[in-house]
A protein has these predicted regions:
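Helical "lid/coupling" subdomains associated with nucleotide-phosphate turnover
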Residues: 1-200
């Protein structure tokens, strides 16, 4: 999410940064650079006109929004992270549909999980077997890579770190957090995710 102030600051910055310098920004498509400043100005104007206090930026675009409009109410109500984790578990795991069973089994241990964290735990259960095709010495790394770099939606950096931390011990890694995770999530969050992973 970006506040109105952040969008205004982005617009001002892009108005003064040369296109040559923008080409050095990692992950920024060179095809978008010529229109980036105009897009930021348009976004700022839209926020002002709509009197919106902020915006949420989607990694997906207009096409996906049009597709979303065609979904049934039940499909729209589904949690996109859980749906994606379930699909990945079906594709990459040995035992399709085990994620829901696994979560029902361990959920009583974590009755105090906040709703936002419970959905991360459910996603971790769906991904619990994604590393089985990897060499046993690298299954934990495979799980962590999928959690951190998977094409997930409706999840932030903390959530990705918690998913990775849950899969790390579940797939044979040590209890300690691998290097990048402590930057993305706090100690209490990673400790809870470790507990999920050990239960898994």
């Amino acid at each position: 999410a970006m506040s109105e102030e952040t969008v205004t600051r982005l617009r001002r910055t892009l108005a003064h940064v040369g296109k040559a310098r923008l080409k050095d920004v990692p992950g920024l498509s060179s095809g978008r650079i010529p229109t980036l400043a105009d897009a930021a100005a348009l976004l700022a104007a839209m926020l002002k006109h709509l009197r919106s206090s902020g915006t949420i930026v989607s990694a997906y675009g207009l096409r996906e929004g049009l597709l979303y409009e065609r979904l049934s109410p039940a499909q729209r109500a589904a949690d996109p992270l859980i749906v994606a984790a379930r699909d990945e578990g079906r594709r990459s795991g040995r035992f399709p549909e085990h994620g829901d069973l696994l979560d029902r089994w361990i959920a009583p241990l974590f009755g105090d999980d906040r709703r936002a964290d419970a959905r991360l735990r459910i996603a971790a259960c769906h991904l619990a077997d994604v590393g089985w095709r990897a060499n046993p010495d690298f299954r934990a790394e495979r799980g962590m890579e999928i959690a951190l770099h998977g094409n997930w939606v409706a999840i932030d950096a903390r959530g990705r770190a918690m998913l990775a931390q849950a899969l790390w011990p579940a797939l044979g890694g040590a209890i300690d957090s691998p290097a990048p995770l402590a930057i993305l999530a706090g100690e209490a969050s990673l400790r809870r995710a470790t507990q999920w992973g050990l239960a898994i």
